[in-house]
Structure formats: structure tokens, C-alpha cells
Regions:
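Terminal recognition/anchoring or ligand-binding modules at protein termini
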Residues: 65, 80-87
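Short, basic amphipathic alpha-helical segments that act as recognition/interaction helices
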Residues: 74-80
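Short helices/loops that flank or line small-molecule/ion binding pockets
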Residues: 58
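Acidic, Ser/Thr/Pro/Gly-enriched interdomain connector segments
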Residues: 1-44, 84-87
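Conserved hydrophobic/aromatic packing and binding residues within compact polymer-binding modules
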Residues: 54
Length: 87
């Protein structure tokens, strides 16, 4: 898969861009393992669905559930997505 460098600023609700789209793609790899959750539209917009998915992810792995994709959330998303993708 891929493991892009952390974008140096936390991603949060309302943000747009390639970093958000990359994170959405990685989240979709994870979400595909959990059929009770819908996959995200990979549009590069950090909207309600992306925020909810990030919060669920943070809660599931024991991070602070704030909906912000900071360094630890970013690294965790891509690390887990890569493990799933390569398995």
C-alpha cells in the first residue's frame, strides 16, 4: 500500500486536500474489514462521515476521541491499513 509522511499539521473537520484523501483511502482499507460501517467517499473533504470514522477508529484503538487526525492517529491509521492490505 503506502505510508505517506505525516502532513505536519493535524487534519480536522473542514480540511480539504490530498492528505485528507490519502487518509480516507487508508480508512477505507480498515473499514472494509468491518461491514457494519460504510466506507468513505474519497473526495479529500474532512466532513461529517470522515470525522465520525476517525472518532470510531480513535475509540477502538484507545486514542483520545477528538476526531482530529494528529500524528498518533495518522500513524496508526496507515500502520493498520498497511497490515490489512498486505495480509
Amino acid at each position: 500500500m503506502f505510508f505517506p509522511e505525516y502532513p505536519a499539521i493535524p487534519l480536522k473537520y473542514g480540511d480539504r486536500g490530498n492528505d485528507v484523501e490519502s487518509m480516507q483511502a487508508a480508512m477505507n482499507v480498515i473499514l472494509a474489514k468491518y461491514p457494519t460501517h460504510d466506507v468513505l467517499v474519497e473526495d479529500g473533504y474532512f466532513g461529517n462521515e470522515t470525522d465520525a470514522a476517525v472518532r470510531r477508529f480513535q475509540q477502538h484503538i484507545g486514542l483520545i476521541e477528538d476526531g482530529v487526525a494528529g500524528r498518533y492517529t495518522w500513524i496508526s491509521i496507515f500502520a493498520i491499513a498497511n497490515i490489512i492490505y498486505e495480509s
